[in-house]
Amino acid sequence: MKLAVRYGALVGVATGAWMFLEFLLGFHEPDTIGRWSGFLSLLFPLIASFFLVRHEPVRSWSLAFGQGAVFGAIGGLVGGLVIFCYFALLNPGFAMDGRTVDPTSQAIIGLVGALILGIMLVPIMRVFIKSRPAND
């Protein structure tokens, strides 16, 4: 599970760095490419889960789901902290669809979303790269 923690943290940092880069490039202004560029951040968990599955085998499907939960939870905690800092400190006036964004709710949504994504993504990635657990 060490790699699940490491790759989860890496995903959180990479996603946060991408969000800051989007801000610096002016993508978070209304009606810009920022409406779509955020979807590129979905590549970070895909790539990290691929390397996690390749380099840290598990013996059962239940452990694979656990590995996904750890991966997602750590990524969500790190990413949620970055999201909170972004909306609370760097861009507090950010508005989406005409309403300002609450930093705490955005961080919680990021954490829960990352946890769900991790639980689903790691076992699915195991199927695609044929790194199946031996039993269970």
Go through each PLM region and give its residues.
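Internal alpha-helical transmembrane segments of multi-pass membrane proteins, especially GPCRs
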Residues: 5-10, 66, 70, 104, ...
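Membrane-helix interface/capping segments
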Residues: 52-64
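Functional transmembrane-helix hotspots
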Residues: 81-100
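Hydrophobic alpha-helical transmembrane segments
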Residues: 100-120
